[in-house]
Amino acid sequence: MRSLLLLSLLLLAPTASASALAQEKSAPKSFAQLTRGLQKLDGYFPLYYDAEQGKLLLEISRFDTEVLYQVSLPTGVGSNPLGLDRGQLGNGYVVRFERAGPKVLMVASNYRFRALTEDAAERRAVEESFARSVLWGFKVEASEGARVLVDATGFFLRDAHGVADRLRESNQGQYKLDESRSALYMPRTKAFPKNTEVEATLTFAGEGTPGALVRETVPAPQSVTVREHHSLVELPDNNYTPRRLDPRVGVFAVEFYDYASPFNEGLEKRWIVRHRLQKRDPSAAVSEPVKPIVYYVDGGTPEPIRSALVEGASWWADAFEAAGFRNAFQVKILPEGADPMDVRYNMINWVHRSTRGWAYGSSVTDPRTGEVIKGVVTLDSQRIRQDSLIGTGLVPVYGDARRGSGSTPECEFGASPDADYLAQLDPSADPARMSLARIRQLSAHETGHTLGLAHNFAASTYGRASVMDYPAPLVEIKDGRLDLSNAYAVGVGAYDKFAIRYAYTEFPRGADERAALDKLVDEGVRAGMLFISDDDARPAGAAHPLANLWDNGPDPVASLRHEMNVRRIALAQFGLGNVPRGTPLSMLESKFLPLYLHHRYQLQAAVKSVGGLYYTYAVKTDGGTSPADVQQIVPAARQREALAAVLDTLKVEELAVPPRVLALLPPRAFGYEGGTQELFAKRTSPAFDPITAATVSADLAVSALLEPNRAARLMQFHALDTSYPDFSEVLAELVTRTWRTPAPPSAPYHAAVQRAVQTLVVTRLMDLAADADASAQVRAVATAHLRALLEDTAPTSRDEATEMHRRATREEIERFLARPAEPRKRTPPPPAPPGDPIGAGRQTP
């Protein structure tokens, strides 16, 4: 019996030991156990880094407290079309951490729908009516009182910025995050009292053949490695007062639906986007701020560009002074060791790409109020090189009649000339000085966006009134020579001060802010502060004659004639003096392209008077409207003047590249086949193709005049008042200028250019006649003019080339007119707004 008992005890002992071990393993570990030996980063959300395991633990104690979660991209891919640039902001959310048993959920609030009321039940009704988004679920690893510890490694090692999606959408291939080649990036992982910053190196592995953009910029295109950044930031306190949007002033806004609004008022609320700025002395007309707005310029910017960025951005100090703040806006160089991704720093980043691209001004904004938390400017280093390219194409600084055709170049701007160099040159003929003037303006422009200001594309028509316009270089003609000394304005303009005053003026305590703002805006409107933004300037069929990109002057038509004169002078002197010694002559083409198309944007401005409409973003006031002029059709005489100026650009002598210049444009030199140069397309490769170049230039005018919306407006305005030109008149003038005006008989080359333009006109007419999106009346008029062109293509006794061209064109028109009809489908009428009081989009059962 004793032996049996002993045996039983021996058999049970291992089982008991294993059970105890299992209980020990399953027992939750404490904070101390999990964090022992780990690197702690104490801050807003404390972090614990396990270097051996490559893990990052996140301590959460701020439950049910809203924080800002912001994603960004510290390192880019380097291709402008991809849109994955260094310093780029990604998605931002207001989130809260919610404990749910063994999990912690990160939940994004939905501030697009809210109720501005003290009634908690009313607020809750709105919150529960619209979905929230759970961004992540964390497993609780340890809990101690009100704080928990979660393993956040997976959260931070994910593609939060959507890089793989962007690569796929850009047709660069299928990429997936490769965890084996991804890791936390601890040099940029930090914790501060009001924000916690985490960065990760992520590698995306490609499947199949990578796209061209990736192949051009990534050393091993199957492996795209970037870094993504995560910020958890304390939201601002409740001492900020939102300010309403006024459509007459171009300030961005956050828009939301307020379901606590009275039922007889609109749901939509719009609060402008701006930094918080308060006077130290509210009673003073001009006061120091409680806390200034400080921007930091990327230390990686070379001189003299760095100083130009500081100077240009600093112009905004004058606007804030006009709004009652002294020393409220400052620009500094980012201190050594400071993290540009830290939300405490408003940044002006200097970004490199393989090709030139847009600059951006964006902001981290509190979606609850519109308050700017961090401004982020992205400036492309290729932009200044493009400005230099334009300038050295206009002016032969590397040797001309004034300096001697073989003179040694003073500067190649890519070498970044210093101030001593700039002092030696005549500013009237110095592209480098012009380029730096442009980069100052660009710095001010993009910084203006981060201060809350939208584009104002009308400001160039009343005295260079805003850096928020897109300025073309103002090239003046003095004594028959081109003068670049006044190419770009210095400082912010009158409209900029007006907009900053609206956004930032602090009114005395007890003042009626709404009335004060209305007065401020009314005064600005009476002073001529016209604001017209992107949606009314960018479309090809835009109607407002004064809302234009890259234009100059109060009269777009006169400015077009001026730019054509500038182009003629520059073409007459274009040659060896436009490139430095030792440069292959084939490189001249990259400078010739912007010169040949120098007039393109001013042409786009002038053509808007044809079928054009002046209008404002007027609002109703006690006395009527402000501005008083709501809209007006462009006078008939003005429309015809603009049409004539636009058609003048189609003259053969304007389109034909001078033979002297053609002789200087050989095929690409050996070793220079690639690169970032932008060149004309060719049907004569490798030789330069002047006929295609002429077609490209002519199409600027032809396509603009045949734009379907412009054509429909012409017909509508003529129906209202027959004194206005109708679309048929415009087409008749276009056909007369291109088909019924003989080319100069001096050269077959000119006749070839004219034939190319004639073919273009017929092609664009056929495109319009077949455009299902164009109105039926517009298509009918286009078709009628195609029929009329059959007479212009009838056989004549002209030269053989002309006869072949006419015969081919006639046959092309006949084939088009006789084309088989497509299967008839019911043409839906333009959609009417929902009429049922219960809404639209779903049918009730």
For every predicted segment, state its role.
Residues 88, 299, 303-311, 433-442, ...:
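Soluble non-cytosolic domains of exported or imported proteins
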Residues 1-4:
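Positively charged n-region of N-terminal signal peptides that target proteins for export
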Residues 333-352, 437-492:
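The catalytic-center signature of Zn2+-dependent metalloproteases
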Residues 23-301, 319, 333-430, 439, ...:
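Auxiliary tRNA-acceptor-end handling modules of aminoacyl-tRNA synthetases
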Residues 6-15:
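Bacterial N-terminal signal peptides
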Residues 314-325, 353, 448-449, 453, ...:
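Sec-exported extracytoplasmic/periplasmic mature domains
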Residues 65, 300-328:
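Zn2+-dependent metallopeptidase catalytic core
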Residues 429-430, 460-845:
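Conserved catalytic/binding loops enriched for acidic/polar residues
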